[in-house]
A protein has these predicted regions:
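Core segments of cupin and vicinal oxygen chelate
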Residues: 2-3, 9-16, 20-62, 98, ...
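Short acidic, gly/pro-rich beta-turn/loop elements at beta-sheet edges
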Residues: 32-34, 67, 77, 92-94, ...
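Active-site-adjacent scaffolding segments
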Residues: 48-141
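Short, low-complexity, polar/charged sequence segments that are solvent-exposed and flexible
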Residues: 41, 62-65, 84-86, 103, ...
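Vicinal oxygen chelate
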Residues: 1-14, 18-27, 55-57, 72-95, 99-148, 173-190, 197-202, ...
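Residues in well-ordered beta-strands of folded domains
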Residues: 58, 68, 130, 151, ...
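Generic "edge-of-domain/loop-turn" microfeature
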Residues: 29-31, 64, 74, 89-91, ...
Length: 263
């Protein structure tokens, strides 16, 4: 999980299909900045305003994520959205439509940040597509406070993994295990994201969604911070092959996971 991004160089982080950015749309942008600033040590500066107020989060002066403000009348779920890299957003958006997905926003230009679109797969899970300009440095990864992994939580993996493979050219590696429905999405042999089929374990009122994992130095301390800052624990800390993991929600309800690198 964390090692997949730590071992990737700048060019690999830009390869088509690779998660290259995460963005959160919230109603109370200032309060959201305060929460994540305290939790991860992020600072903020203005970003592209094409879709409304938007800031870029920085860690040690390098970009790590983005946050935008939803209009008060917009009742969309508050959620972290991963952006998958593309060398031609318009072509990728057309592939999304041809393969049964939908494109809700764009493609559109985002000033110096490049070109983007926001789409959904056939099951309804929302993701972004980003064509970054060559001069733009990739987001920082591999240290606490940065995205470590992205995972699609859905009903079953077979059909949805085919969709993403068709659109982005992923190689797919199913996990062979009774009762565990999981597919790893790879680019040039490198794991970049996962698809986890949970069947009826998925809340019907939520639907399939992309989950974002952030690396932390100490999972237990992070959970204490989350609750102290007004967030809540969704799934308590537990050991995994990739480190100690927990799932939490920020004060507006955006769910994300944190993982402590075991190395």
């Amino acid at each position: 999980m964390t090692e997949a991004r730590e071992s990737a160089g700048p060019q690999a982080l830009r390869a088509p299909g690779t998660p290259c950015w995460v963005s959160l749309m919230a109603h109370r942008l200032t309060a959201t900045e305060e929460f994540y600033g305290e939790l991860f040590g992020w600072e903020f500066r203005p970003g592209p305003q094409q879709l409304g107020p938007y800031v870029r989060a920085l860690l040690d002066g390098r970009e790590v994520a983005g946050m935008g403000q939803l209009p008060p009348e917009n009742r969309l779920p508050i959620a972290w959205t991963p952006y998958l890299g593309s060398d031609d957003v318009d072509r990728t958006a057309e592939a999304v439509r041809l393969c049964g997905g939908t494109v809700a926003v764009g493609p559109l230009d985002a000033a110096e940040a490049g070109r983007l679109a926001i789409a959904a797969d056939p099951s309804g899970a929302v993701f972004g597509i980003w064509q970054a300009p060559a001069h733009l440095a990739p987001a920082i990864t591999g240290v606490p406070g940065t995205p470590a992994w992205n995972e699609l939580i859905t009903f079953e993996t077979e059909s949805v993994a085919k969709f993403y493979a068709s659109v982005f050219g992923y190689e797919t590696e199913p996990v062979v295990s009774a009762g565990f429905d999981y597919v790893t999405l790879c680019v040039d042999g490198r794991p970049v994201a996962g698809v986890h089929g949970v069947g009826h374990g998925l809340h019907r009122d939520q639907g399939p969604y992309w989950a974002t994992y952030f690396e932390v130095a100490d999972t237990a301390e992070t959970l204490r911070q989350v609750t102290g800052l007004g967030g809540r624990i969704v799934r308590p800390a537990h050991d995994s092959p990739h480190g100690r993991v927990a799932t939490v929600a920020d004060p507006e309800g955006a769910v994300f996971s944190v993982v402590q690198d075991p190395h």
